[in-house]
Amino acid sequence: MNDIGIEIEQLNMPSITSLENIKYIKALGGTYGEPGHSLTGTTPFNSRNFKQEKPAIIYISEISHNLNNKSYFYGGGYYRRSGIKNVLVGKYTDKLKQIEVVPPQLDNIDYYFEAKYKANIGDTVIGAFRTQIFVTRSDVVLIEGLKYDRPIISAVYDSLGRIKYKYKGVKVKNE
């Protein structure tokens, strides 16, 4: 742009900003890095390296129905390139089963996942994958206090980041 007479004062670089590549943003003249998945520790770099950043998001759903000895659960906000392989399913944390997931078709965004196991309807599903929250009808629940083993729900947001509920110290039930 400078070559054609347009002065650039700010250069916002694309997503996947992380501690690993922020030095390159600076070296390339970038003044901003899109936070995106760096806030949740779910950049492609984080799938193999947790030295500097740890994933800070989990996906919670429930088994909605069964068909032909397989279970299905809602997967709103799934990012089709995330490579989900397994989820944990069950009623109690000490009895969760690791279940293989059949990823949905690439052209879907809010849909049901198929789990290769017949679980109980209503069982909790816990997954970890790269999300696209802004294109879903799902909510985001902020939980604080995990570092101190005292989790509390502090707020619920819609997919556009608007606050739906704000809580003061609601304790998470830990069975």
Task: Show which residues each predicted segment covers.
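Intrinsically disordered, low-complexity segments enriched in polar/charged residues with Gly/Pro
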Residues: 49-51, 103-104
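C-terminal accessory subdomain/extension
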Residues: 68-175
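A residue-level signal for beta-strand positions that form part of recognition/binding surfaces
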Residues: 30-32, 60, 70, 124
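A generic structural signal for short, solvent-exposed coil/turn residues
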Residues: 3-5, 55, 105, 119
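Short coil-to-beta-strand transition motifs
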Residues: 53-60
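Active-site loop/helix belt of alpha/beta enzymes
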Residues: 1-49
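A general, composition-driven signal for non-globular sequence regions
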Residues: 46, 59, 110-114
